[in-house]
Amino acid sequence: MTEEFTPPPLPPPFTSNKTPPVLLAQGAEARLYKTDFLNPSFPAALKFRPSKPYRHPILDRRLTRQRVLQEARCLVKLLKEGIPVPGVLSVDWNTGQGEDETGNGGAWLLMEWIEGPAVRQVVNHWEKWMKHCESATKGNNSGMNENFERSAEEDIRSLLRRIGRVIGALHKAGVIHGDLTTSNLILRGQSNENTTNIDPHSTTLKPNLEGEIVLIDFGLASQSVQDEDRAVDLYVLERAFGSSHPRTEIFFDEVLKAYRESFKGASSVLETLKKVRMRGRKRSMVG
């Protein structure tokens, strides 16, 4: 008989909310909630970093404070530069004055809730839809209509170019994301009927690839203008496409082309990316 799941404790002041925050994700360092603490019609994202009982209390407070403030500072800086990221609503880096986890110690960051599907979900849907369309025309002498195929591929290319531009703006502002994956890119401002509310196994509906690219989850972010750091950011995203989106990977150059056009220092970053790739390949060969 399995034990009933007990939700982890929340930090104050969220413990007094009539409608408790909904736990969306739990990682090694933080928990992500959706909450209407401020206003029922104004949802927000709550990122809570609980204290670690296995760490020395002074070290724990220092590390937790450093990480939550680093994330908040990066977000505020990017917002000032006009880069689409969640707005910072509130931050507390000394919750419970460093008590252990049962006392809800740690730190939290309250952010704007970004409505929309993750790019990972949308691209997966596009790949399944393309496969379905190809199967539907299999056996036809003309195969898939060339104009249709070009149009569908241009849609995904356009999405990748938008991703490249927003990453270029991110790096131009001197911020490194640290965890660039398609799960940390959100498409905001589009109708979700063909994305978030569909059967994930459905392949008959054409996916909606429109919307503004919003960067989320800056838990590993840092401020840097080094080509190496920027190149590693791009390499992480490139590997994410290779592992999660094999059909779309062949269009990844669209990301890099748009990135190159986004700021003057992009060319040297892309040269460094070639070296990072070589190191990555050697590491894979060695194991």
UniProtKB/Swiss-Prot annotation:
Catalytic activity from the UniProt record: L-seryl-[protein] + ATP = O-phospho-L-seryl-[protein] + ADP + H(+); L-threonyl-[protein] + ATP = O-phospho-L-threonyl-[protein] + ADP + H(+)
Composition bias type Pro residues, residue spans: 1-14
Segments of this protein annotated with the region Disordered: 1-20
GO cellular component terms, semicolon-separated: chromosome, telomeric region; cytosol; EKC/KEOPS complex; nucleus
Principal location class: cytoplasm
Residue numbers annotated as active site: D179
Pfam families (alphabetical): Kdo
Keyword rRNA-binding: no
Subcellular location as annotated: Cytoplasm; Nucleus; Chromosome, Telomere
Domain notes: This protein is considered an atypical serine/threonine kinase, because it lacks the conventional structural elements necessary for the substrate recognition as well as a lysine residue that in all other serine/threonine kinases participates in the catalytic event. BUD32 has protein kinase activity in vitro, but in the context of the EKC/KEOPS complex, the catalytic subunit KAE1 switches the activity of BUD32 from kinase into ATPase.
Protein family (similarity comment): Belongs to the protein kinase superfamily. BUD32 family.
Name of the protein this chain belongs to: EKC/KEOPS complex subunit BUD32
Organism: Coccidioides immitis (strain RS)
Gene expressing this chain: BUD32
